[in-house]
Amino acid sequence: MDLRDYIASIPDYPEKGIVFRDISPLMANGDAYREATKQIVDYAKEKRIDMVVGPEARGFIVGCPVAYELGVGFAPVRKKGKLPRETIEVTYDLEYGSDTLTLHKDAITPGQRVLICDDLLATGGTIKATIELVEQLGGIVVGCAFLIELMDLHGRDKIDGYDIVTLMEY
């Protein structure tokens, strides 16, 4: 199965000159969604994962079924003010401005082996911040899994030294 058949490419969205890669068709097709999940699970099995972490919102869509299949928990990374209990936070730069991601202080225990899942690796800012959150709590990031990598944006360079798998490249 070619998962690219289930990615919609929308030109000039959200602004002119950008091609948005929409994973909605993949999620809407049970076979494609299951295949994407299986490929990430197969990657993760040998890593002895204790916890899956995913940044909002599409990291939840990718990470939750992976955690379920691996029989481990899932910890959500959210924007500031969205998690109800005590959190840690990391602020990172965007193209115009900055953003802050948070994680519950008790989401990861020291030494836990963590897989981070998200839909897209673009500039690398979100994944770098997510790694920092996990490591602040003593977690060990043993892998980062993405449905899509946008090669021209070189996000992989920001997380050099981490094991990365992407199912599709554009």
Swiss-Prot record:
- Report the Gene3D superfamilies cross-referenced here: 3.40.50.2020
Q: Which enzyme type, at the first EC level? A: transferase
Reaction(s) catalysed by this chain's protein = AMP + diphosphate = 5-phospho-alpha-D-ribose 1-diphosphate + adenine
Q: Which GO terms describe its molecular function?
A: adenine binding; adenine phosphoribosyltransferase activity; AMP binding
EC number per UniProt:
2.4.2.7
One Pfam family, please name it: Pribosyltran
| UniProt keyword Repeat present | no
Gene Ontology cellular component? Answer: cytoplasm
Q: What family is reported?
A: Belongs to the purine/pyrimidine phosphoribosyltransferase family.
According to its UniProt entry, what is the function of this protein? Answer: Catalyzes a salvage reaction resulting in the formation of AMP, that is energically less costly than de novo synthesis.
How is the quaternary structure described? Homodimer.
Q: What name is this protein filed under?
A: Adenine phosphoribosyltransferase
Q: From which organism does this entry originate?
A: Enterococcus faecalis (strain ATCC 700802 / V583)
